[in-house]
Amino acid sequence: MATETLDKQKTIDLRKKHVGPSCKVFFDHDPIKIVRAKGQYMYNEKDEKYLDCINNVAHVGHCHPDVVSAGAKQMELLNTNSRFLHDSLVLYAQRLQATLPEKLSVCYFVNSGSEANDLALRLAWQYTGHKDIITLDNAYHGHVSSLIDISPYKFHQMAGAEPSQHVHVALSPDTYRGKYREDHPDPATAYAENVKEVIEEAHKKGHEIAAFIAESLQSCGGQVIPPMGYFQKVAQHVRNAGGIFIADEVQVGFGRVGTHFWGFQLQGEDFVPDIVTMGKPIGNGHPMSCVITSREIAESFMSSGMEYFNTFGGNPVSCAIGLAVLNVIEKEDLQGNALHVGGYLTQLLEDLKKRHPLVGDVRGRGLFVGLELVRNQSKRTPATAEAQEVIYRLKEQRILLSADGPHRNVLKFKPPMCFSREDAEFAVEKIDQILTDLEKAMVLQRPEAAILETGHIKRKDASDENGLVHPSNGNSHKHTSTIPLSKKTKRN
């Protein structure tokens, strides 16, 4: 058991006293104090084990021994800034580039996803000579000022906030809840035409487009999977307008989607972005990130006459850790695990949808999966309070899951890549039980696929900054799961 010097309440008190109040924790009314972690599990101060279904930072598993060892050995030998020559920088850049199309060959190492996306904007502005950025509704790209401006997920939260005159918001390519849905004959073209319309409106105002930026699969926006062909069509419109395409892989890169190493590759081999940004999983918890672009764009950035330097970006310890992460992904076939376990998880959730009127949609690729809850399947009324109830009750079962999307009603699975079939069964079994309890409490009826909206749970709408709603104090009903599991999984 890990040794902690403070009891939980003392830690909470000191955090309130010394840490900014806008820096929130999960489950704000009763946060979990985590003292150690290993693989896909996290442990509190009582050494109670939680299944981590949301931590895409610990990509190859919490505290993976190969990653820990690589960082420790390099730290004992050398850690300095990138103005000194050292092999790990160039070897790591070479390994990263080998996972990408040949055109993407030049790396800039930085320290966070926000730094990476901010630098990507600078590259776009310099290369095109234009100023305006197109972003997607509900997108999130980072917390620095330039990125809050292009993150509707954030600026929509601020009363009266409007995007800057140089930022244009296109429709999110959401085929479940968006303007063009799964019954549309060609949603990719329809959503891409919206981007073209945004460009034309900008031109009417005398504005020129520098870049279109999008997460390869929207995460905070609700696990949105763009329709096939969408990126190709958007890139054509944007490039015709003199702009470039930035693929934000901070959330979904490094094999998480299973079939491919990068999320943008789901669109097909004929699509190559002009800039790719990566972060979060790249260092398995170590702060590092990267921007990779073409030689042409890099030379344009150099032509400004301003040197680019980042004190910690590409330091020897970060590069050693990054190399270790790539080695573990390959050695343990974690991309293959994401494909097979993710497919199994998706199938279990699809089975839930057949039995539970609260489940509106299941969508995802690999170990990036969303379960959207609704009060009415035909109207797709968001079940926001119910989604929060689920994640709080899962916490009581020692399963960590979050809800996101514009209505905070999408349960998000993005666990460490060592997540197993047994973990998937355990999590879905508990969700099955909780949904059954909630549906009983709501006194729902199910004529065909529709459910009544009149009986939803009465509760205070006490959303906190994490998008979590404090749960009711009602007791759960006892329930025997009917989910067809290959075997029941017991947890300590």
Curated annotation (Swiss-Prot):
Q: Give residues where N6-(pyridoxal phosphate)lysine occurs.
A: K280
InterPro entries named in the record: Aminotrans_3, Aminotrans_3_PPA_site, PyrdxlP-dep_Trfase, PyrdxlP-dep_Trfase_major, PyrdxlP-dep_Trfase_small
- Example GO molecular function: pyridoxal phosphate binding
Q: Which Pfam families match?
A: Aminotran_3
Tell me which GO cellular component terms the UniProt record holds: mitochondrion
Give the reaction(s) catalysed. Answer: phosphoethanolamine + H2O = acetaldehyde + NH4(+) + phosphate
Q: What is its EC number?
A: 4.2.3.2
Keywords assigned by UniProt, alphabetized: Lyase, Mitochondrion, Pyridoxal phosphate
The organism's place on the tree of life at top rank: Eukaryota
- In Gene Ontology terms, what is a biological process of this protein? embryonic hemopoiesis
**CDD domains according to UniProt:** OAT_like (cd00610)
Question: Localized where?
Answer: Mitochondrion
Enzymatic class: lyase
Q: Give the required cofactors.
A: pyridoxal 5'-phosphate
Q: What does this protein do?
A: Catalyzes the pyridoxal-phosphate-dependent breakdown of phosphoethanolamine, converting it to ammonia, inorganic phosphate and acetaldehyde.
The family annotation for this protein states: Belongs to the class-III pyridoxal-phosphate-dependent aminotransferase family.
Protein name per its UniProtKB record: Ethanolamine-phosphate phospho-lyase
